[in-house]
Amino acid sequence: MEAQIHILEQEAYSAVLRAFQAQADEFSWDKATVMTNLRKELRISDDENRQLLNNVHNDDLIKRIRDSRPRGGNQVVRHQSLDVHPSPTFSASRKKQKTFQSYPSIGSTRSKSFNNRVVSANEPAEALIGRKVWTKWPEDNSFYEAVVTQYNANEGRHALVYDINTVNETWEWVDLNEIPTKDIRWDGEEDGVTLNVGHGGGTTRGNRRTLSHGGRGRGPRTQPRREHLATENGGGRKFFGEIELFNTDSLVKEVERVFDSNLPDPHELDKAKKLLKEHEQALIAAIARLTDASDYESDGEEPYSHELPMLLG
């Protein structure tokens, strides 16, 4: 039963990925957050995530939708106030061959445009989860975008995930108080705002990279046991209503029919997009119900979890 549920979870995750990819070439921040939450709820491992992303990128239907999309439309604006330069290739000492989206050293942010949401001096460490941040790596003097996904209170460290929801996703555990204020920028931070997340101390960055195996952003995932939901009315199994979804094969054929034509009818294009959107919403609703059902069916087994481990160097 558990294996069958996980197959459904993979199919659901892949379907949402495809729908998002069909809507736009790049994920908005809201969609990236949705996918991160889905990975947790659907127990999608790192390897599974990479494989599913590759499958979506190589999907013929998605390619046709991309090719038919007007260039410059529906694109996500990525902080145009920061001059993005080509990402450097890191040395072998980092034990990985990849690049991050990077930003030149921004020094003073007086001329930069951030939104008005700032980091409060008394803000608890957990409140930073979900925030977007740029940290500077001394090796190339460039800033790299990440999102804070977790906080370990015992160690006083936050998990920073780079290239989130992509095949290049990597992460590290960081004591944010070890990073000099000039080397960190928050989405929503104005010039002169200092960071104080209420834990630890120190002003040096020497112990920042604590991953002793596999370089920055690599390490095994933990699989803690999940607690079961309490049964209602003193016992018995909770029965869930039927889940109704579009027939995926029929939906794909309908969308392919629209995009296979040389001059797609705008009305038909809108209809296809609406179908994809409705399918996406139905899948998200079904996923929530499947997650509840999985809790009752797991019966003490340890499902996947995607919390990042603390690697002690």
From Swiss-Prot:
Entry keywords, A to Z: Coiled coil, Nucleus, Phosphoprotein, Plant defense
Location of the ENT domain: 1-88
Extent of Basic residues compositional bias: 206-219
GO cellular component: nucleus
Record InterPro entries: Agenet_dom_plant (IPR014002), EMSY-LIKE_plant (IPR033485), ENT_dom (IPR005491), ENT_dom-like_sf (IPR036142)
Positions where Phosphoserine occurs in the chain: 294
Reported induction: Slightly induced by heat stress.
Keyword Cytoplasm carried by entry: no
Record note on disruption phenotype: Reduced resistance to Hyaloperonospora arabidopsidis isolate Hiks1. Slight early flowering phenotype.
PROSITE patterns (alphabetical): ENT (PS51138)
PANTHER family the UniProt entry points to: PROTEIN EMSY-LIKE 2, PROTEIN EMSY-LIKE 4
Assembly and oligomerization: Interacts with EDM2 in nucleus.
Function: Probably involved in the regulation of chromatin states. Contributes to RPP7-mediated and basal immunity, especially against Hyaloperonospora arabidopsidis isolate Hiks1. Regulates negatively EDM2-dependent floral transition.
Protein name: Protein EMSY-LIKE 2
Organism annotation: Arabidopsis thaliana (Mouse-ear cress)
Gene name linked to the record: EML2
